[in-house]
Every structure is written in structure tokens, then in C-alpha cells.
Amino acid sequence: MADITAAMVKELRERTAAGMMDCKKALTEANGDIELAIENMRKSGQAKAAKKAGRIAAEGIIIARSAGNVAVMLELNCETDFVAKDASFRALGEKVAEIALADKIADLEVLKNTDFGNGESVQVTLNNLIAKIGENMNLRRIVIAEGDNLATYIHGSRIGVITKLVGGDADLAKDLAMHVAANSPQFVKPEDVSAEVVAKEREIQVDIAINSGKPKEIAEKMVEGRMKKFTGDISLTGQPFVKDPSVIVADLLKQKGADVQDFIRFEVGEGIEKQETDFAAEVQAQIAAMKG
């Protein structure tokens, strides 16, 4: 039996909005597996708002650049929001993006070992900034996209999107990049949703219907309609267009004679846990480090 810690209970509460004792019980029954606990709580109706992506805690910036038919997007992490807003930190990230774009470097290790333009590698230059500011930093991920109709969109330096279209125009590609940033679709089209994702959601929805008092055969019929809505909700082309919710993205694309080949969405700190720190102490620590 896994040890159920206060931190695990706290995370489950934040991700489900359920009570402390319910979370502790769910974790115990799931042997400490948070994702399984969320799934079980959804089935029983306890989870009010299970957040699919989990908590986003790490700090940093997303940078995107494009030229012609090539676009690049990267994530540069740091420990605090204080440093994420630092001009030298941002300048380094922008220069790295320009280097990657110029040479179409999609391999992170190759990029880290590429000359920064100062006689030292990207990683050594980053290490020098770490020593200067006194906070750990990491060039976490990078992606290169190529196509005839590409667009990039950055929202508040924390969310970045590249869209790749066939047909349409630059404005449409940019609008859809903005849509992806705002609505976080997981797939391009409903038919792209994996069988595993569909099966898991179907099981959850059937259990919810049965627990509400419906016979199993009726519950299964009810779920068919819910599943169509589910696959549409998590797919770009099935969502209402962010700039005009009366239009579904699939219909917008048809009107414009365009198709979405792919999209890539980065959000700062996805999947990274960050130790909680007192903000005032965090600021004082950064000021002291800079003075030192």
C-alpha cells in the first residue's frame, strides 16, 4: 500500500475541487495513483473539475519565430516569474530561437552545442547567465515546422502555437493559432481522437449514467450522443471558432477552402512540478543574488 502524503491530497484537491477526506479515500483506493483516483472520482461524480493537463507550475517563456515557410518555437524555463521577466533572460531565448530558425535545428542537444555567436555554445552561454542571475535555467524543448501556410501566435509569453494549413491565407492561419492558444484542443479532427481516449471516456460516461439511476442499456444509448460531443470538444475542427462562436471551425475551413495539417501548442511548465515558495522571500532572494 502506497503512503498517501499531504502533498498528494493537496494536488488531488486542486485538480478535482473535491473535499479533503474524499481525496484521501480516493488516493487510498487507487494505491496512490493520482490519475486513477481522478478517473474513479469522475465515475462516481465526486470530481467537479478534473484538469486534464494537470498543474502548470514551472516558470519561463515561450518564443516563436518564422521566416518564409519555416517556423520555430521553444520553451526556456527558469525557477521564478521574476527571472522570466528579466531582459537578459528573454534576449537569450530570442537569440537561440533565431539560431534554430536560421539552421533549422530541431534537435535540442545539437542546439545546445551550437555556437551562440560569441565563441561559446548555447549551453555555455546559458550557464554563464545562470551564474550571473543565480537561478537555474533550462532550454526544455524546441520544434521546427515547415509548410506553405504557417502561423505563430504567442499569448503573454506563456502560451505559444504554430499552425500549419493547406490552402487559406495568412490571416486564417493566425486566427486558428489564436484559437488553439485559447481553447487548447488536443487533436486536429474528431476522427483523430485515439481509440484509447475514446474508450476511457466512454467507460466514465456509462458509469456516470448508471450511477444516476439509468439502466445499463439506456445509459449506453445516452452515451453515444455524449461521445460525439466529447470528440468534437477536444478537436480543433469540432470547436466553435473563438472569434465567432456561431461558426464551427470545420465549417470555417470549408468556407475558406482550407485544411489544417497540424498544430503545435506549448504552455510554460506543462508537466513540471515546482516547489511552492513564499513570494516575498523569493523576491528578496533574487535581489540578494543579483547584488552578490
UniProtKB/Swiss-Prot annotation:
Gene3D superfamilies associated with the record: 1.10.286.20, DNA helicase RuvA subunit, C-terminal domain, Elongation factor Ts, dimerisation domain
Name of one Pfam family that matches: EF_TS
Keywords for this protein: Cytoplasm, Elongation factor, Protein biosynthesis
Molecular-function GO terms, alphabetical: translation elongation factor activity
Superkingdom of source: Bacteria
Cellular compartment(s): Cytoplasm
Coiled coil: none
Any one Gene Ontology cellular component term annotated for this protein: cytoplasm
Keyword Protein biosynthesis attached: yes
Region of interest (Involved in Mg(2+) ion dislocation from EF-Tu), ranges: 80-83
Keyword Kinase annotated: no
InterPro entries per the UniProt record, alphabetical: EF-Ts_dimer_sf (IPR036402), Transl_elong_EFTs/EF1B (IPR001816), Transl_elong_EFTs/EF1B_dimer (IPR014039), Transl_elong_Ts_CS (IPR018101), UBA-like_sf (IPR009060)
Role of this protein: Associates with the EF-Tu.GDP complex and induces the exchange of GDP to GTP. It remains bound to the aminoacyl-tRNA.EF-Tu.GTP complex up to the GTP hydrolysis stage on the ribosome.
PANTHER family reported for this sequence: ELONGATION FACTOR TS, ELONGATION FACTOR TS, MITOCHONDRIAL
Family according to the record: Belongs to the EF-Ts family.
Annotated protein name in UniProt: Elongation factor Ts
Organism: Tolumonas auensis (strain DSM 9187 / NBRC 110442 / TA 4)
Gene name, Swiss-Prot/TrEMBL: tsf
